[in-house]
Amino acid sequence: MNRSLHLSESFVISCGTVTLDIDRSKVLVIYLRKTGEYFLPKGRKDVGEQLEATAVRETYEETGYIIELLPLQLTTLATLRGNDDIRSAIPGGTTEPVAVTQRTTQGVLKIIFWYVARGDSCAIRQMNTTEQDDENFDAIWCPMDEVVGLLTFHDDKTITARVIEAARGKVPASYSA
């Protein structure tokens, strides 16, 4: 068993989304003009904010699109009340995190909880949201079949591929550990 302890001044919690427009087979990504990087929207949790709310807010602030969490049929270690099988898919889908990533930069641990969301690629993008002004982002709806190749970071590619598989019904209902 690996253990680590991080006190409040040595970690930050962030949340992000893989946002799908299922009807049009598209995924919402961010293009950072100054570096040429493509990545998933994410950002820091505010004090007292729920993780799910952080994911939705940060996606809106960085992209200008209104989204909502999307229940998907995913295998999870989270338990259902009254169900001892912790390696099963949730009937009807779940909005639990699809992944968690961790990285340490300058001694600070960043933990990112990833959620699946739905959005409308034909919706009118809200302009002048907080992050757009400061970060020089473009929001791009990329075809599902092309997005993994477009994304810059390995973790974003892996998470997005898994979400697309789940959205297409290709994730097994259970697995063996």
What annotation goes with each model-predicted range?
Residues 23-81, 177:
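Conserved Nudix-box catalytic region and its N-terminal flanking loop in Nudix hydrolases
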Residues 1-8, 168-177:
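Eukaryotic N-terminal low-complexity, Ser/Thr- and Lys/Arg-rich leader segments
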Residues 109-161:
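NUDIX/MutT-family hydrolases
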Residues 1-22:
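Acidic, metal-coordinating catalytic segment for phosphate/diphosphate chemistry
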Residues 16, 26, 138:
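Conserved beta-strand and immediately adjacent loop positions that scaffold enzyme active sites
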Residues 12, 33-35, 108-112:
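Short connector loops at helix/strand junctions that flank enzyme active sites
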Residues 79-126:
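Active-site-adjacent beta-strand/loop module that shapes the phosphate/pyrophosphate-binding cleft
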